[in-house]
């Protein structure tokens, strides 16, 4: 038993030593250790078997994964394609929705435009209908008036009443009445540039802020529409995600689903972040623009604030300086009095100088008044001459009318003589000797009529001679002028001379108006100088009164002697104050010197302005001399015209002597007739030239001629009436020639009138130039007046400031006197100074009395000048009214300036609010920039992680290869070990120790292998996850690129569509413009056709009227007419035949 126990103990001890258990082993715990050791061996064997089964299961699972892998790939490809197709469908839907919206907006615009065009078309059609109705009514009215004005009844010398047609009375107006040359003078308006600039700045700022508000509102509307679109897109995407999640839930592993959900969430986050990045970039751009604008406004505001602060500092400095000046003026009143006396002396000198200038101006005014009187006398003389000339013109026109009527009568007489001779010969041929005793009676009546008319014209000529002789007795000048006018052979000379005289008259009137304006300007200047003189006199009196009051106050400031004993202790303090006062006195002297320099500078400026006014006066005098020279030239021209009139009067006397004989009259009329025939030939030549201009109206004339031809064809069916119409047509041709002559005369008259118009237009242009020069001079004078007013206002302000300073000086003086009562030594010195001041006051009183005497003399002179200027105050009252109006306007402008200041304060408050908003926006921008920077950093971190993971993947793949190689080697070793174990089972007892050690080593290696396998599994999982993430990232990149590409394509397509729409708009606008142009062209054509139609109607009516008049004149003169021809052809019905 002991040997068996010992053997067991030795075996167990060895095994424990082999396994590394070195602890002590007692005999009592030997059975327990045996059991534990047997259990350990059992567990190791079971572990070995489980590992083998696990290896087999892994091999089977690897085979299963290899079989399922192509199905997984195919399923993933199909799902990806499905997702891409669905994304494209969504994009197409969005694009179609946007396109539909744009088409709807364009359709609405087109509908509005079509509605507007329809409305305009209806309006134009309605207007055309109204115009057509009005034209029809007017045409009917014209026809009615023409029918009313066609016929009239005239009693012929034979006692019969015949109806003749009168020409329609016409009134040809070449041009409207010329406008009045003298327009209302522009009222000068004072312009304050500071107020205008502030108002303009405020208005501009308000407009800019309103524009910014509108732009922000538009951007907000755009952003809201974009948010709506994006919300719709997000809803569609979420629906798609839900659909895909439902589709992919069945038969998928939870890991894959979780990974896909993570990828989807990551994609959503990335898309959302991209959208936020884009939105934030756009917001950054807008905010940068806004910040720039606000910075600019801030700079402007800061500049304004700096300017205002500088102004405030300057004002503070000026206030301190004014305080110092007040103190110095208080302590040094004597020097102030001396400077005031000096200024008064200078003011006296200026008053004397201005009085001398006023005297010079009055002398010039007197000279100009004399010249005005002379010019008015010349004007009256010229007006009388113009009246005489107008009478002569009327006489000349009457003579020309009589001459034309006589020429017409002579032509009608010649025609009637020819017709009578023809009738006599025809009567002789038809009726023989029986008709002889009838024709002489007609000739006798005709000759008697001619003699009566001759006697009538003789009487008219004698009456005209009697009128001319009577007017020649009244004034020799008018008689000469009349005779010269009667002797002028042509009307063109009369018109040219009359137009020259009228032109000269107009020029003289303009010269007089200029002189009157110049006199008014001089009077206004004199009035201004008198006003300034009165103001200076008032200021001088006020200054003297203030000086006397100051001196009285200085005499009354003697302190009582009782206070002297109480003030001895304060002597030292008073001495220190005196020293300080002396220092301030020196500073005050320097200030006074500076003020005197400023006053001298202002005086020099005033002297410069006076020199400028003297230069203006010299220029006006030079203009006056030029006008005098022009008047002399006009007189010379008038004398030359009088000589011409004398020569023409002599010629007219010769003509009047020759006109007593009737034969000479007939010869002269024949010569005139020949001249008229020559002029008719010339006018026919001119008409042939002008017929080229009437080609546009020939189409309608041809239509009328065709109608006339048709009527002629109808008339040819009647042979008897055809011969009569031929004769009448010959007569009408003759009258047509006569009318052509009259037309040519009218064209000559029109040419003369056009020349006169051109001359008048030239004269009007010269007058306009002169008026513009006068207006410029008036504006300059107004500017000088405004400058003077500003200078007067500045002087008033300075006087107010001086009064305020004097008041402050008085107050500070009272305080100083109270302090001086406490002083003792100063009282003695002040007593001495008071004595000296009393002496100076006596001298000042004497000077005041002298000044009073001078003032009385000055008042007498002023009263004399006021008596002289009393007559001119009525003329200057209008200028005072204008000045009051200007003053009221200035007050209104001041009120507006205050309003503008209030508005500027409100604008400043708005700017402050805008600054606060800008600060908030800046803070927000900074926060957004920080978020963007964080996103960018995260993006970089993701990229760095991806790169590190790729490197780790490559490293792990290499390690896996090494481990697989090691695994293969280990498996080979295991197989060799198994073979050795099988071989060594027989020698189990011998190799137990070796087997135990090897088993332990094997177990250790197995543990390490399991660890390696678990690590490899984990690495595989990590690799698969990383590959999946890489694929997801690549798909995200691809989708982002596709999105960008599609967005680029959509933007390009939108741009092309916008360009197409713009081209369509331009085409529609061009069509509208072309249609409007065509409408205007058609209207112009309609107007031209209407005018042509009216002209042709007038021509037809005149031709009808002339034909009827010719027929009636032929009937009146007894020519062969259609009814006469019928009487001649049928002698049995005539009364003469009955007598036979």
Curated annotation (Swiss-Prot):
Q: Name one GO biological process term.
A: centriole-centriole cohesion
User: Cross-referenced Gene3D superfamilies, in alphabetical order?
Assistant: 1.10.287.1490
Residue runs in coiled coils: 75-151, 199-416, 447-644, 668-1036, 1079-1113
Amino acid composition bias (Low complexity), ranges on this chain: 1121-1133
> What range does the record give for the signal peptide?
none
Q: What is known of its domains?
A: Coiled-coil domains are critical for microtubule binding via the formation of a two-stranded coiled-coil structure in homodimers.
Tell me the domain of life: Eukaryota
Q: List modified residues, type Phosphothreonine.
A: 1121
Annotated positions of the Phosphoserine modification: 383, 439, 688, 1130
Summarize the protein's role.
Centrosomal microtubule-binding protein involved in centriole biogenesis. Acts as a scaffolding protein during early centriole biogenesis. Required for the targeting of centriole satellite proteins to centrosomes such as of PCM1, SSX2IP and CEP290 and recruitment of WRAP73 to centrioles. Also required for centriole-centriole cohesion during interphase by acting as a platform protein for CEP250 at the centriole. Required for the recruitment of CEP295 to the proximal end of new-born centrioles at the centriolar microtubule wall during early S phase in a PLK4-dependent manner.
Subcellular location(s) of the protein = Cytoplasm, Cytoskeleton, Microtubule organizing center, Centrosome, Centriole
Q: How does it assemble?
A: Homodimer. Interacts with DCTN2. Interacts with CEP250.
Site note Microtubule binding, residues: 101, 104, 108
Q: Where is this region: Homodimerization?
A: 11-64
The entry sums up its family as follows: Belongs to the CEP135/TSGA10 family.
The answer, when asked if Coiled coil is one of the entry's keywords, is yes
Q: Which disease is it linked to?
A: Microcephaly 8, primary, autosomal recessive: A disease defined as a head circumference more than 3 standard deviations below the age-related mean. Brain weight is markedly reduced and the cerebral cortex is disproportionately small. Despite this marked reduction in size, the gyral pattern is relatively well preserved, with no major abnormality in cortical architecture. Affected individuals have severe intellectual disability. Primary microcephaly is further defined by the absence of other syndromic features or significant neurological deficits due to degenerative brain disorder.
- Protein name from the UniProt record: Centrosomal protein of 135 kDa
Could you name the Gene Ontology cellular component terms for this entry? centriole; centrosome; cytosol
Q: Where is this region: Disordered?
A: 1114-1140
- GO molecular function: any one? microtubule binding
Where is this chain primarily localised?
A: cytoplasm
| UniProtKB keywords | Coiled coil, Cytoplasm, Cytoskeleton, Disease variant, Disulfide bond, Intellectual disability, Phosphoprotein, Primary microcephaly
